[in-house]
Structure formats: structure tokens, C-alpha cells
């Protein structure tokens, strides 16, 4: 099992209602899962728990071999090396080229220069940006910037890719291209967990759907659509 949440509850002191309430979810290696639900349903907390950015109030969180809520200090970066993250707002380094943005993800974990020089061009080819390695982010379209962000998340070949509204700032055609790319990455064996509000993407792809509402798990459905009655 790649991801396990076992009776996980997260209670913030500032709220009377738990952000997550007794959540039980298991995700296998290589699955593609949509995490859906309205704002405030607990999606962001769910993902932050996987990254050890939050600690559950009760229950167990596991990612691959990592017992996440028992990790301490120096072990947290080891967990994050096996998880790639993609966000709605790209979060690129504006003064670095496409190549250097992707290479930076390997530099910070101490990869050798020869390995970086070998792997980065391969990943840029995968995301369709081989010809734009020397461009700066402000010279790219929104879709191209998201491709850079995906390349950066994938360059270390993570076991899990977390995508938080990766198409939220993109037009429908560009969104479809980004989803095609995420599907290709998923086919390499990477587990993909994507939080989204995009009905059209969820309905067209018919992947597993995990739905949260007010911190509770209300649906876990294979080949699901966005709404239960659609």
C-alpha cells in the first residue's frame, strides 16, 4: 500500500469541528485518485498530513515505508524526497531558467552534477519543453509554466505525486494537456493524488474519486464522477 490513513482525525484548536474526522483511506501503488469536495472539506489538510506538514490529532498516516506521524526532524526530508508536489500557482523561481528550476529540485537534495545533467533533459523532453530549457518563467505561457512545475516535481522520480488544483489557473484546452501529462507520469508507476474542483476533468477521466465533506469521508468510488448522481 502506498498511502494509508487509518482512523485519522485532525482537530485545530481554533475550530470546533475537526478538519478531518476519522478518515480511513488506502491508496495502492500506481493508482490515480481524485480528491474532491467543497472548500473547507479537508482536502488541504489531507495533503499536508501526507507531507508531515501537519500531525494528526489521532490515527496513523503512512506513505510507503514512512510512518508519517512518527517522523522526527531529519527524517522528514527523506519522506519529502519520495513525494513530488504541484500547485495551482506554479511557484517557480522567476530568476532561474526552465532548466535551472528543474535542476534546483535535485541540487537541494545533493544529487551529483553529472546525474543532474543527465536527468533534467530527459524530464524536459517528457513534459514537452526540450526547446525552452533556457527560457525564464515570464517568457512562458501558463500551461508551459505548469509543465515546468510538473517536471520539477517529477525529476526525482517520486513514488507519489500530489497535485493541488494544478489546472485551476488554466483554460480548458491547456488543462486537458496537463491532465494528459499527469496520466503519462501515472503510467510510469507513480501514484497520483489530485485535489480538484474541476467537474469536467473528473467526469471525463473516470478515475477513483475520494470525496470529503465537512471533514468526513462521504464517498470512495472507483471510476467515479464529480457528483454522485451525474
Curated annotation (Swiss-Prot):
<dbReference type="GO" id="GO:0016887">
    <property type="term" value="F:ATP hydrolysis activity"/>
</dbReference>
<keyword id="KW-0132">Cell division</keyword>
<dbReference type="InterPro" id="IPR027417">
    <property type="entry name" value="P-loop_NTPase"/>
</dbReference>
<dbReference type="GO" id="GO:0000287">
    <property type="term" value="F:magnesium ion binding"/>
</dbReference>
<dbReference type="Pfam" id="PF00005">
    <property type="entry name" value="ABC_tran"/>
</dbReference>
<protein>
    <recommendedName>
        <fullName>Cell division ATP-binding protein FtsE</fullName>
    </recommendedName>
</protein>
<comment type="function">
    <text>Part of the ABC transporter FtsEX involved in cellular division. Has ATPase activity.</text>
</comment>
<dbReference type="InterPro" id="IPR017871">
    <property type="entry name" value="ABC_transporter-like_CS"/>
</dbReference>
<dbReference type="GO" id="GO:0005886">
    <property type="term" value="C:plasma membrane"/>
</dbReference>
<keyword id="KW-0131">Cell cycle</keyword>
<feature type="binding site">
    <location>
        <begin position="37"/>
        <end position="44"/>
    </location>
    <ligand>
        <name>ATP</name>
    </ligand>
</feature>
<dbReference type="GO" id="GO:0030145">
    <property type="term" value="F:manganese ion binding"/>
</dbReference>
<keyword id="KW-1003">Cell membrane</keyword>
<comment type="subunit">
    <text>Homodimer. Forms a membrane-associated complex with FtsX.</text>
</comment>
<dbReference type="InterPro" id="IPR005286">
    <property type="entry name" value="Cell_div_FtsE"/>
</dbReference>
<dbReference type="GO" id="GO:0022857">
    <property type="term" value="F:transmembrane transporter activity"/>
</dbReference>
<dbReference type="InterPro" id="IPR015854">
    <property type="entry name" value="ABC_transpr_LolD-like"/>
</dbReference>
<dbReference type="GO" id="GO:0005524">
    <property type="term" value="F:ATP binding"/>
</dbReference>
<keyword id="KW-0547">Nucleotide-binding</keyword>
<comment type="similarity">
    <text>Belongs to the ABC transporter superfamily.</text>
</comment>
<feature type="domain" description="ABC transporter">
    <location>
        <begin position="3"/>
        <end position="228"/>
    </location>
</feature>
<dbReference type="GO" id="GO:0051301">
    <property type="term" value="P:cell division"/>
</dbReference>
<dbReference type="GO" id="GO:0055085">
    <property type="term" value="P:transmembrane transport"/>
</dbReference>
<keyword id="KW-0067">ATP-binding</keyword>
<keyword id="KW-0378">Hydrolase</keyword>
<dbReference type="InterPro" id="IPR003439">
    <property type="entry name" value="ABC_transporter-like_ATP-bd"/>
</dbReference>
<keyword id="KW-0472">Membrane</keyword>
<dbReference type="InterPro" id="IPR003593">
    <property type="entry name" value="AAA+_ATPase"/>
</dbReference>
